[in-house]
Amino acid sequence: MEKTKDPADRSSRSERKRRDSFGMFDGYDSCSEDTSSSSSSDESEEEVAPLPSSLPIIKNNGQVYTYPDGKSGMATCEMCGMVGVRDAFYSKTKRFCSVSCSRSYSSNSKKASILARLQGKPPTKKAKVLQKKPLVAKLAAYAQYKATLKNQSVNKAPVTVEGFSWGNYITSNNVIAAPVTCFRHAPMGNCWGDIAEGVRIEVPNTDSNLPTKVFWISGIVKLAGYNALLRYEGFENDSSLDFWCNICGPDIHPVGWCATSGKPLVPPQSIQHKYTNWKAFLVKRLTGAKTLPPDFSQKVSENMQYPFKPSMRVEVVDKTHLCRTRVAVVESVIGGRLRLVYEESEDKTDDFWCHMYSPLIHPIGWSRSIGHRFKRTDILKKQESNYDAPSHLFIKVKDVEQGSEWFKEGMKLEAIDPLNLSAICVATIRKVLAEGYLMIGIDGSEAADGSDWFCYHASSPSIFPVGFCEINKIELTPPRGYTKLPFKWFDYLRETGSIAAPVKLFNKDVPNHGFRVGMKLEAVDLMEPRLVCVATVTRIIHRLLRIHFDGWEDEYDQWVDCESPDLYPVGWCQLTGYQLQPPAPQSNKDGQSNVSKQKKKSKSQPYKGHKKNFRKPGNRP
């Protein structure tokens, strides 16, 4: 029996460079450069320079927003009744204030209660995904919605995935799943080895009438992430007893384990009379075949150990003000995902979910070191049992040299909107921080106090040079209220007196990630990051992936980097004990589609880009 090779002996994956197709847009100049700056402080909120007073300013429930056209108008959510700025509402129809309300409305109308399941408490205690009241993350209506919540009594149904099976889903739809090797941050991602179709393993024999637990040898017929379709040896081309299981499960063993462990190998009773000499049959079938490495179970166990522990303190983005960080404490760790509770939360309900390799978390003192805004925590509320997470636990960013040709305030670029991850928008560098970090604002929809500026590192795969969308045939979302359509960068730079950020400063590295269009996976809904959902890769642009959540409309899609720690192989939730959100029933999707079709925007309206979903990252957990 041949063992699979240790992947450590393999050569590292080849790296290839993204073609530099943006040179034609590099060096756009204007008569003058708009470079506004703002002061900074170490551990307190700093004042941010307001946007030019020439733009109309709209106040909505305590938050101040500017709109170039001054024609925003108001709208009322058909689900929760909240009133707010129309342009801040979700979807093209502007019928709902948030993703949650849109989904809830559709679900309730079809008696499916999808949102109730999405926001409820999971049945498995191991998952510990806590139930809490939803927070509408629209910056324009956040305060009013919080007031509304106090007057409402919402009963949520427990989260359930009854009836959903990855195996049945893969088989019935005849689709493939992304291999485990695509997810280097996931358990076994770096040591999956030669596990492939044809590998033989020893598994429990469920086709037996014996009173004790017995085993038999099976072969992998098909792989889907951590899951494998298995067929007992002796069934040949008969698939009647094929079954799916998680390869990393405790009952999966390499061939030979039963012999060394003293466990009985018994053929399935359906075929036990097929051969008179099963030993000779197995010798013939297994000669030259591969099996799992003998230490496979040990490696799985080691890969399920995580360095972050409860009570560790970190700095994490403030989900109510994206421009600053706050101190949070690790409450629980599930599969490398952290449930962080903001240190000032007395009842531990003000939380935030992210992976331990997320660029949104940092060691204590990070904000001060780079000049990032920080919300100081009341020292009296600190618990003695909490301690600062060691700095070596955090993901390291790429070293950059901030020379004379570095990014400058006022430069234009294209960026994934952190409040609407389905859109890549026209953006501006609002502030240059230390160590390569930048504060980015989305043109046309920034809060006047800069509270929705977002911190990206210069090497981030979520920012792009001017012209990236045009060259790669991606719809670029123009500034809200911009009427000169179709949008042309050359004209916009001239009109705003701005220059494009130099192309050479952007990250052009493209790893050989292995993803293909149509592959299935489990993905975090970053608009409500406690949820991990059934998803599909629908488009690939270099290292950028378009992730679609099965059962939901395309407007819920999200742009994600191929190395994002928020993507996982099929079977990850089962392996770690996390709750998987199944696809929405087709009836609900159809209902939403019909509503959207009936209320399409009039062609006379000038703005045709994606509407920003004013949802703060992290408000689902």
From Swiss-Prot:
MBT repeats lie at residues 164-268, 276-373, 374-479, 487-583. InterPro entries: Mbt, PcG_chromatin_remod_factors, Znf_FCS, Znf_FCS_sf. GO terms for biological process: double-strand break repair via homologous recombination; negative regulation of DNA-templated transcription. It comes from the Eukaryota. A zinc finger (FCS-type) spans 68-103. Chromatin reader component of the NuA4 histone acetyltransferase complex, a multiprotein complex involved in transcriptional activation of select genes principally by acetylation of nucleosomal histones H4 and H2A. The NuA4 complex plays a direct role in repair of DNA double-strand breaks (DSBs) by promoting homologous recombination (HR). MBTD1 specifically recognizes and binds monomethylated and dimethylated 'Lys-20' on histone H4 (H4K20me1 and H4K20me2, respectively). Monomer. Component of the NuA4 histone acetyltransferase complex. This is MBT domain-containing protein 1. It comes from Xenopus laevis (African clawed frog). The lineage of its organism: Eukaryota, Metazoa, Chordata, Craniata, Vertebrata. The gene is mbtd1.
